[in-house]
Amino acid sequence: MINILELESSLGFGGQEHRTQRVINGLDKSKFKVFYGLNPGSKSLEKQIECEFVEFNLKKSFNIFEILKICKFVKQNNIKIISTHSGKDGTIGAIVGKICGVSVVRTRHLQLPITSPLPYNLSTKVVGVCDSVCADLIKRGVKKEKVLKIYTGIDTQKYTPEFKINMKKEFGLNDDVVGICIVAVLRAAKNHKLLIDAFSELNLEKSALFIVGDGPQNKNLHEYIKDKKNIFMLGNRTDVSDFLGSLDICVLPSEMEAIGGALLEASSCKLATIGSDVGGLGEAVSNGKSGFLFENGNKEELKKVLERLILDENLRKHMGEFGRKYVKEIFSIEKMIENTQNLYMELAK
């Protein structure tokens, strides 16, 4: 049995915490036992995760008393691998690993520049969630031989073309209306306003835009769309997989993005996708096959590809079909679990 200690200092439950949940739940329980070290009050404590939760104080990168406490836990529980994800826990995990002589896997989920390569280079292996993230890590000083890509996996059995909720019908729209969506936290970097402007300026009949998510830009965006037609804000939804298949196009116009899991989930539901050409979105969207990429911030280019997909039903269907195959082949949750288990088995030798 290989005992693993996951550490996560983040209190929220976003994309990277979803990935960690999928990995933990997918690991072969006859080979791996997982302890999940979290801050008190972490939202992950409320989730269905097949592990043993442990509360640590991970609010500071260097707290000698907490580091010694974690070292004691590692030795008492025969931990073979420490897995870290965020800035503070990444530094703590790297230090504990060196003190205890335990392998450390640091996963980088974000496209944002790292502040220092040191905690990464102190780790045994550094996992990037896409080629773009891996390349940026190496560019910023992380040793190339430590870096390994493991794509974020999508649950293709959960995200399917079938749907329980018809979102068009929910808003009194006919089935021939082309449903466009963006599924993202409402923050400025996601560039919602660019999509809203592009959609509104096209002003095409039989099309509607659904904005799914919540966040700091909620009030601003409600105000921004109040005089615009056929734009609906759904707020935060926990049932996205139940209605995504009832829509037709998914757009992510982010200024910065790692892998863009929302686009992969949409492709798994056979939606055509559109993404800005930043970070790992060029990997999430197979340009010209599962959807289109457009130049970051270029509204006219976004309008062009959006109009093309709204007006061409056959193209949408063709791209949706290709997209699901593409996700199942490259971004399946099974492949992510397999690659992660292989890494852990190698490090535990």
Predicted features and spans:
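A conserved mid-protein helix/loop that constitutes part of the nucleotide-sugar donor-binding site
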Residues: 14-22, 178, 182-201, 216-222, ...
